[in-house]
Amino acid sequence: MCGILAVLGCSDDSQAKRVRVLELSRRLKHRGPDWSGLHQHGDNFLAHQRLAIVDPASGDQPLFNEDQSIIVTVNGEIFNHEELRKQLPNHKFRTGCDCDVIAHLYEEHGENFVDMLDGIFSFVLLDTRDNSFLVARDAIGVTSLYIGYGLDGSVWIASELKGLNDDCEHFELFPPGHLYSSKEKEFRRWYNPPWFSEAIPSAPYDPLALRQAFEKAIIKRLMTDVPFGVLLSGGLDSSLVASVTARYLADTKAAKQWGSKLHSFCVGLEGAPDLKAAREVADYIGTVHHEFQYTIQDGIDAIEDVIYHVETYDVTTIRAGTPMFLMSRKIKSLGVKMVLSGEGSDEIFAGYLYFHKAPNKEELHQETCSKIKALHKYDCLRANKSTYAWGLEARVPFLDKKFIDVAMGIDPENKMIKRDEGRIEKWVLRKAFDDEENPYLPKHILYRQKEQFSDGVGYGWIDGLKDHAAKHVTDKMMLNASNIYPFNTPNTKEAYYYRMIFERFFPQNSARLSVPGGASIACSTEKAIEWDAAWSNNLDPSGRAALGVHDSAYDDQLNKSVSKGVEPEKIIPKMEVSPLGVAILS
């Protein structure tokens, strides 16, 4: 994928404007260090910074149809491009790039082709025949995209805020699953799956169908002409991604080019839970494993860069984005340009620990729907921008459209957590891959308790961030926080510290409005806090704040509960010992 910037209808076709567009496009160069392109048609400019993954030799952008009347700049991967090419027998393609089909599909189907694309994408298409344009973003918002408006009536599109924040009067997130047509001058939702209405589904749980849908999502994402690997934290989601990838890699084109030995990557503080678990999974599935350790000071030193690149002041995004940012730099230094990652599973399968308190299947399902709809503001944004800061692409198979349809069609009663039956969080996913004859993972990894990435890299990480923020934000500053930051007022010193840095880079009102807010417990929505009255006094996005659920909850909070006579519950899933002998590293 890449970085895109478009300025449309700016009433200025001067050389000075072209130079300015080039200057702004270079702010996105980290997203695409392999090639730069700019096409101007009158007062319309389409710029592109390319990260070459498919057809690196000839897939430079912008892309065109045969007579160059249709111009496209794309940040994306179209996994079904070969199938789509077969549906366009009368068209001649200039490149082997997967995104080359977009201009030709538009010629055949007009604006109604977007749902035909199976992939992740953000694109701007300019039709020079009538000077109209079309902008679209993928279903869930895996790719990042913003839209802005100039005082001269121009429309601006950019992969990141920094491409347009200084030149637009107003800008905002481009909504995922939507397209914007200059002909209609409005947004239109193109992605309308059954689950989007939040009606309660009733399909029976079919573990084999779920497993097969996920395997297909993985296999299609092995489309690459460059070296790649998997992010492996040792948690359920990344471990399943790694296991399935390792199992099917040998039969792919990628294996013929780069070898059938999968590379895996993990990051953490010394002694972190994730490092140990990831090492064990890597040994079990046979990957070439790369382990990166960082110190709390390394992470603190990177905070400003992380906030600049990820473009948020959301606490949990920065906590998790920092180690991912550091790891991505190491991965890119090894010559790897694409990784598979495990984002999205917790939202789909009610995996966050606060779901233990869901009162019924209706509220659980509605919460999962809300979480998926908001992914583009949180985990998708983090995974996209913290990797692209170093020219590394992250693909997320759990957010495959067809897989989501299967997973979100399951009667949510099956996702309810029932400890007395051994059903812990994400039970339906764990059960689907609990294969006694041909195991995907060691049993205790398959049933490892949910650990948020910012916790799993080492419990000292969050504590270190809080201590550092306390040195820079005084009690007096906190008393005045609502006057300084009336929107999304920071309620902790850590949040205040991140907000100060963000405002320095992005001082515009539109920028601060682009970041989500609201109270949260262990990454919940504000609505879910009502599930447990005690949570309102313990608002922290860490999974360790899920008192009575997390096995390593904050010690001081546990002590308070015990002093009140409340015994924290431990989750002990019912499971059988794996028939395979697995060495547990100490």
UniProtKB/Swiss-Prot annotation:
Its EC number is 6.3.5.4. Residues 193-516 form the Asparagine synthetase domain. ATP binds at residues 231, 267, 341-342. This is Asparagine synthetase [glutamine-hydrolyzing] 2. Residues 2-185 form the Glutamine amidotransferase type-2 domain. It catalyses: L-aspartate + L-glutamine + ATP + H2O = L-asparagine + L-glutamate + AMP + diphosphate + H(+). One of its GO terms (molecular function) is asparagine synthase (glutamine-hydrolyzing) activity. The lineage of its organism: Eukaryota, Viridiplantae, Streptophyta, Embryophyta, Tracheophyta. GO terms for biological process: L-asparagine biosynthetic process. It comes from the Eukaryota. The active site is at 2 (for gatase activity). One of its GO terms (cellular component) is cytosol. It comes from Lotus japonicus. CDD domains: Asn_synthase_B_C, AsnB. InterPro entries: Asn_synth_AEB, Asn_synthase, Asn_Synthetase, AsnB_N, GATase_2_dom, Ntn_hydrolases_N, Rossmann-like_a/b/a_fold. Pathway: Amino-acid biosynthesis; L-asparagine biosynthesis; L-asparagine from L-aspartate (L-Gln route): step 1/1. The record marks 343 as: Important for beta-aspartyl-AMP intermediate formation. L-glutamine binds at residues 50-54, 75-77, 98. Keywords: Amino-acid biosynthesis, Asparagine biosynthesis, ATP-binding, Glutamine amidotransferase, Ligase, Nucleotide-binding.
